[in-house]
Amino acid sequence: MNKKPELLLPAGDINTLKIAFDYGADACYVGGELYSLRAKAINFSDNDLKQAVDFAHKHNKKIYITANIYAHNNDIEGVREYFHFLNIIKPDAVLISDMGVFSIAKELLNGIDIHISTQANTTNYESINFYEKLGAKRVVVARELSLNEIREIKNHISENMEIEAFIHGSMCISYSGRCLLSSFFTGKSANLGECTHPCRWKYDIKDKEFDLIENERPDEKFSIMENERGTYIFNSKDLCMIEHIDDLIDAGIDSFKIEGRMKSELYIATVARVYRKAIDDYINDKNLYKNNIDKYKEEIKKCTYREYTTGFFYGYPNETAQIYDNNTYVSGAKLYAIVDKVDNEYFYFEQKNKFSVGDTVEIMSKNFDNIKTKVLEMIDIETGKNVDSCPHSKQKIKIKTDIMPKIGDIIRSI
């Protein structure tokens, strides 16, 4: 039997990092303020990165830092300076896609693994063997690979070389995220972390011609072209492999990667908890996993998501993998609070969404139980007065319920 896979979660800031670990992640990948292909994310300051590494290692978890831009000449000295810093704080690995950046990493990083980012578009075993010879420890394979292709890759590479694959989250409609649409429309390059997501915009086909017109640019027409690989500019469903943990493990994937460094705390907690439970159930009792699939599917839909697809894992996806009529998410539960403190009667938190005395809320426990409880009393901490609801963002509140949560538990709507 293949080994138990690593569960790898994204984190956009230190709070989501702690939540990811609390709810079951074995490792997290994060980005600094530069070089990480997520310019819109809050990202981690240098001090945050050090704190993240220290926190992860204190809790026997791993931390991977992204440095996966395609560097231009004016980035090189900054990359060198950044890697000197990473060499001090010692993350477990750095993710890289650019070979110049790889060369700098080999020169400057000691005791830090190099992982090849999915941006490198790795689709065959010869590439992976080449990266191993250069000194890489792991490759994040392209999303465009099927499980059969991944299985074949595993059969042609060293046992020491690890394969990481995205198994849940948003999918880029362009090949391995190498998109120029954002750069063309707005001057902001996806390959430098500035993607404005034109693939999610609404477009019209004018007068039944095969021309593309974006709503805000009625005078600009673009001919629609499609080849055997499909069209590159429409709205993809989200990837979800929660029903196929057995096939992922059988293919030999070493690390199950979740997309979403810009996703919410509730999303990270929900997805981490569901995949943690599914992986553990499968490893411990395959029948238990199969019997719980409906429960996993129900739970994974309690965070915000687009309709789900299995992507390329079972062959090239057809038109059902895209969403043609809208770009909206399906809304799940609302995040009310994350418990900061507990005493004999009350628990304390900073409000995330409004709720009221008398409401029934749900505690997301770490052991996969969803515990319904009624709000009996609510006190504004700053005024010390009883209130009927908490309508203000970041309002500091303590409440009494008939069941007490634990520190770090998430409170959400039913």
Language model segments and positions:
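Surface-exposed amphipathic alpha-helical tracts and adjacent flexible/coil segments at the periphery
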Residues: 1-23, 27-34, 53, 59-69, ...
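Glycine-rich, positively charged N-terminal anion/phosphate-binding segment
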Residues: 38-54
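Alpha-helix capping/helix-boundary segments
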Residues: 100-101
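Conserved phosphotransfer cores of two-component systems
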Residues: 109
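Beta/alpha (TIM)-barrel catalytic core signal, keyed to glycine-rich beta->alpha loops juxtaposed to Asp/Glu
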Residues: 121
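Conserved nucleotide-cofactor-binding alpha/beta core module
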Residues: 125-126
